[in-house]
Every structure is written in C-alpha cells, then in structure tokens.
Amino acid sequence: MVAGKVRVTMGFHKSPSTKKTKDMPSPLPLPPPPPPPLKPPSSGSATTKPPINPSKPGFTRSFGVYFPRASAQVHATAAAASHNGVVSELRRQVEELREREALLKTENLEVKLLRESVSVIPLLESQIADKNGEIDELRKETARLAEDNERLRREFDRSEEMRRECETREKEMEAEIVELRKLVSSESDDHALSVSQRFQGLMDVSAKSNLIRSLKRVGSLRNLPEPITNQENTNKSISSSGDADGDIYRKDEIESYSRSSNSEELTESSSLSTVRSRVPRVPKPPPKRSISLGDSTENRADPPPQKSIPPPPPPPPPPLLQQPPPPPSVSKAPPPPPPPPPPKSLSIASAKVRRVPEVVEFYHSLMRRDSTNSRRDSTGGGNAAAEAILANSNARDMIGEIENRSVYLLAIKTDVETQGDFIRFLIKEVGNAAFSDIEDVVPFVKWLDDELSYLVDERAVLKHFEWPEQKADALREAAFCYFDLKKLISEASRFREDPRQSSSSALKKMQALFEKLEHGVYSLSRMRESAATKFKSFQIPVDWMLETGITSQIKLASVKLAMKYMKRVSAELEAIEGGGPEEEELIVQGVRFAFRVHQFAGGFDAETMKAFEELRDKARSCHVQCQSQTHQHKLCFRSTPC
C-alpha cells in the first residue's frame, strides 16, 4: 500500500492488472462464467511492471533502483489473498451446482416414478371398481341370506308348533282308540275280534300321512281290482254289521286329515315315515302264476263272473245252436297268422261274427237315396279321443315334486339305509319275472306297486339302487293297456239303455262308447308296432295284442252295442208312427252306425243281424209310406181346380 501511495504522489497510474486484481474479490450475485485463468504473480516487479515508455527509458530503469523490494512483496501478498477468495467462492459455487445437479437428478427420478405410477392408476382403478362391485354383491347376498335365514327360522318354528300339535292330536286319538278298544272288548268274541282289527286299521290310517296317499295316486293302477286282504275283509264285515259309531269316527278322522294344510301334511308324513322306516319292510310274496289264480283274479277284476271271456256277456243258447251252418263264410276270410294258438274263447268269439253284404248294400242305397243329408260329423270322435288321451296322460302323470326339506330328505335316507334288503328282493323279482299270459302281469304289477308304495318316495329311493326301470316300466305299460281295454269291454258289455231316457242322449252315449272302443283298437295297433319287440325282450306276452287277442273281444262288444243301438232306433220308429223328416233322420242315423260297426268288427252275429233286418224292414215300410203320401199329395194337387 505504501508503494501505491508513492506512485500516486509521483504521478504514476495504476496498472490494469492491479485494478483487475482489486476488482476481482467483489461478490457476484449470480454465478458468472468462469473467469480467464490468472497468472500468478512470481514477484512484485513482474506483477506491477509498468509499460516501458521509449521516451523515458532511463528514468524507468533508474526508478526501480530507488524503491526497495519490500513494497513489491506486500503487493504480492494482497493479490494472493484476493485470488484465494475467488477460488473459495468458485468452490462454493461448484458445490452449489453439484447440489443442484443432485437435486435435479432426484426430481427427474421422481418424475419417472410418477409417470410409471400414473400408467398403473387406470388398472388399479378398474380393479378397485371390480372389488367394490363384488363387495356390493356380497352385501346383497348377505342380506338375502339373512332374509332366507329368518324365513326358514319362522317356518321351522311353525313346523315345530305343528309337530307338537300333531303329537298332541295323536296322543288324544290313541287315548280314544284305547277307550274304544276297552268298550269293544266287552262284546262277543267274533264281533270283538273284527272291531279290534278295524280300529287297528284306523290307527294305521291315523299314522299314515297324506304323502303316502298322494304317492299311491301316482299310478293309474288305482282303478285295478284290489286284492282282498284280511284287513279289508274285516273292514267290510264291520261295515256290513252296522257299527255306526266307528263309521262316523272314521269319516271325521279322514275329513280332519283332508282339511290340514300342505305344510302340516308334509311335516307329519315325513316324521311318521321316518319313524316307520326304522323297521325293515317284510315284503309279501308275489302272486303265483297259475291258471287257477289267473281265473280267480280275472273273476275278481270283472264283476260279471265268466271264465273264458270276462267282459262281454255270453249270448243266449239259441244263437249258438243256429250258428253252426255258416262256417263256410268264416273260411272265406284269410286266417290270422299262426304265432301262438289263440284261446278257445277267442276262437268262439271270432266264429260268432260274419260279414253281411246286405248291410253294405242297404247302407249305400240309403246314402244314394238321402244324398242331400249331411255326412257324419266326425268331430265328436276326435274330441272324445283327445279327452281319452288327456285323461290317460293326467292319470299317469306324477304329482309335483315335494318341497326339499330336511325331514323329507332324512326320511329318504332312512329308507335307503333300512330298506335295502326289501328293495333288493323286489329287484330280484322284477328281473326274474317271465310271463306267458297277460292275465298274470296285471296282479304282478299291482303287487309291485303296493310294495313300492311303502317307500316315502319311490323315485328318490330307487335311484340309489340298480333298479330295472325299463323292465318295470314295460310291465306297467302292458298292464295298463290291457286293463284299460278290459275295462272298456266291460263297460260296453254292461251298458244298459234306460227307456225313460231320451233317444238322442241314449244314442249319443252309445256312439261315444263305440268311439272309445274304436280308439282303443287303434292305440293298441300303434302300441303293437312300437312295443312288441320291447315286450318280447322282457319276456312279456304279446299274443293278446294280435287281431285274434283282445281286439276280437272289443269287436264283439261293439257288435253287441250296435244291436242295442238298432233296437233303440226301431223302438223310436214305432213310437213316432207319423213319418216325416224325424223318422228318416232316425233311419239314416241307425243305418250309418250299423254300417260303421259292421266295417269295424268285420261283420255281425246272429242277434245283431236280426236287429238289422228289423230296422231294414221298418225303413222300407217307412219309405213306401212316404212314397204313397207323396203320390197322394200329387194327385190332390192335380185334382184341385185352378
């Protein structure tokens, strides 16, 4: 500093380098660009060397001689200090830049992570939405399950109350039965035995549920002739003996069961069937397949006692004596195929019917004469056939599935566990069943259904065993068809016209009955085409399905029905006795029905032929009378003056 002051006083200016070094330490607000490298001063003379003036060379050289070296050293120290300050400032700025660089790198990394997280956000949002939907569904399911649980709890409480009521009712009924037994025990021995058995049956009725009754109603074999058991015999004897108190008691007891609700019936029936199923069922032996038994069952099945042909009544003896002359006409028809030889009764029935050409000729002549009349309306037969099909389908349909409840399932499980030997016995009997006569199939199917009705639910229990379902169904199908046809034959043979009834209603009834017979034959022919092979494979007889089998009995019954029809028409013609359109309409109606039956049955027997001849004679006399009346009217018209 001393040297500087000296220079100022002597008129020397500061060197630019010195000014630069003095200005360097000033602080910078912003980091400036790096300054150019400074030359470190080696000595004070080198740093502050003034420019050489050529005009004063000597003065300059001599001027350096006059100043000592101490001033130069002081100036160099100050410059070094200022340079160190600049370096430290630069270092500080470099550190700040490095810190900012690290901060920017961190921010860049955060930005990258943010971008990656942003790309994942839509997927996460969709997953969150799905989970929220699942949570809502689970909440709804939980609410629904809670409602179901509450409803089932209420139903369970109601069923418990009903069960307790049923138990109290059973106890009361048992007490009443015990009292009645005590009263009955004081009577005579025979009467006491029958009454005790009857009240034992009443106790069984009170123990059995409506479920088993409904299951028994499933099969259409409920119309089959019931085998008469000891229990039923005793019941019949009691009813005939006139025990009015027991009858009233039984009616009231049955009505009380019929009025109970479905839930009560199900609960009671399930619990009682579970208790009953604890004891294994001891099956009854199947019916024997013998001729005597077949005849006896046949006699029991059909009210008219006949051995050869149960349904149709036998004709009186005179026609049988008059019948031997026409065998040649029977030989004209082609004989039936010879599979199994038909029974004697069937051959006799076929021999009674022969073709009568007069019926066809008279019918065609009448149709030509009365061509203006409308043709037969066939809609009635179609409706009757449709009703018959609907009735059969409704009769064979199963009752709706029983509600899926724990007591019901427990009863089924109990039957499966306890009735195994019983069901295996039935499986063996069905598998080994082989028949040569259809009359043996009907009682066997009836016995099988009676045994299966002991189970709580036949289908639900049998599906746990190797049940021969196809063979059992084939046996039922054959028995149903045969029994339905026998029932039709019996109905036609037992038909009795009431003279007090109007002719139109009586004739309509006979027409409807004939249409049933006709439909039965047609359905049997369709069944023969489709089920004959199946029946043969299961060893079920098929000879009854042939034309020489039950079809001949149906045709004979239709011939008898035609005889009654023509007799009723003849009686109506005698009652009219006035001629006119009513009489002609009756004649046309009777001849049409006779022709239809003649074509269906293949002919008439002797009695029916007599009835037809009587109708034909009356028709001819009526026609002659009408022609004479018409002729008289014409003569009167001509004789009348204009």
UniProtKB/Swiss-Prot annotation:
User: Do you know which InterPro entries this protein is assigned to?
Assistant: CHUP1/IPGA1-like (IPR040265)
Q: Where is the composition biased (Pro residues)?
A: 26-40, 302-344
Return the annotated region ranges for Disordered: 1-60, 223-351
Which controlled-vocabulary keywords does the entry list?
Answer: Cell membrane, Coiled coil, Cytoplasm, Cytoskeleton, Developmental protein, Membrane, Microtubule, Stress response
> Subcellular localization, per the record?
Cytoplasm, Cytoskeleton; Cytoplasm, Cytosol; Cell membrane
Per the record, the GO terms for biological process are: anisotropic cell growth; cellular response to mechanical stimulus; cortical microtubule organization; cotyledon morphogenesis; leaf pavement cell development; petal morphogenesis; protein localization to cortical microtubule cytoskeleton
Bilayer topology: Peripheral membrane protein
Q: Name one GO molecular function term.
A: microtubule binding
Ranges of compositional bias, category Basic and acidic residues: 247-256
Self-association and partners: Associates to cortical microtubules via its N-terminal region. Interacts with ANGUSTIFOLIA (AN) on microtubule upon mechanical stress to regulate microtubule organization. Binds to the microtubule-severing enzyme KATANIN (KTN1).
Give the family this protein belongs to, as stated in its UniProt record: Belongs to the IPGA1 family.
Name of the protein described by the UniProt record: Protein INCREASED PETAL GROWTH ANISOTROPY 1
Organism from which the protein derives? Arabidopsis thaliana
Its gene is IPGA1
